[in-house]
């Protein structure tokens, strides 16, 4: 089925609602069931990028910091720490960007199933910005294979091609873009210190050239 829901909000139960709102409650309950129990094996999309996130739910706030309040406070991947130690960032604002929250949600959902694929087109900031080193470590500990294609096109950084030529965005936005595919395999035993194998590539140039390469 197709459900209207806010993925970044914790799943809820609905009891004793007025009859005229029952249809909305039924849809919310169905969506909550998917969040909690359905064996979701593929999460894909192009989530919004917003450093000034309007999604300020407590569940996601704690999940980003390594605590799953939907599972009795169980410890989980912490984007605000590396090797168990706090990042110590003076301004960790960008870890609260909406696209980071959607990646964290998708990671959590695939972990609950035990295996699956996360495929997102997002802001490319998390690939190399030091603020995201806890996020990168968490993703590498959670998945077995990671495929990253940095499409660049960041006009804020005035990016150029390696030869000094013009580099354009694939969208009509200023922020650079990346494609990330994260694979968690079934039946794989994970030990402390295990990290995903990562494949990384860059794509520079004009928009049409990038489209041609992506369609090849």
Protein language model annotation of sequence segments:
Residues 1-148:
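SAM-dependent methyltransferase catalytic region
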Residues 54-58, 89-90, 108-216:
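Sequence-level detector for compositionally biased, low-complexity segments
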């Amino acid at each position: 089925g197709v459900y209207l829901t806010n993925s970044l909000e914790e799943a809820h139960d609905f009891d004793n609602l007025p009859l005229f709102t029952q249809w909305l409650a039924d849809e919310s309950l169905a969506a909550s069931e998917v969040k909690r129990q359905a064996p979701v094996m593929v999460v894909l999309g192009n989530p919004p990028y917003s450093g000034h996130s309007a999604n300020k739910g407590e569940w996601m706030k704690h999940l980003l910091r390594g605590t799953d309040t939907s599972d009795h406070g169980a410890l989980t991947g912490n984007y605000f720490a590396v090797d168990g130690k706090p990042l110590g960032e003076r301004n960790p604002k960008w870890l609260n960007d909406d696209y980071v929250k959607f990646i964290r949600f998708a990671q959590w959902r695939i972990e609950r199933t035990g295996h699956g694929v996360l495929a997102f087109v997002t802001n490319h900031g998390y690939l190399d910005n030091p603020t995201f080193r806890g996020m990168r470590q968490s993703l590498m500990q959670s998945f077995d294979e990671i495929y990253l294609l940095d499409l660049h096109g960041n006009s804020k950084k005035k990016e150029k091609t390696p030869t000094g030529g013009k580099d354009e965005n694939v969208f009509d936005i200023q922020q650079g873009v990346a494609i990330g595919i994260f694979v968690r395999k079934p039946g794989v035993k994970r030990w402390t210190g295990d990290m995903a194998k990562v494949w990384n590539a860059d794509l520079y140039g004009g928009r049409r050239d990038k489209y041609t390469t992506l369609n090849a």
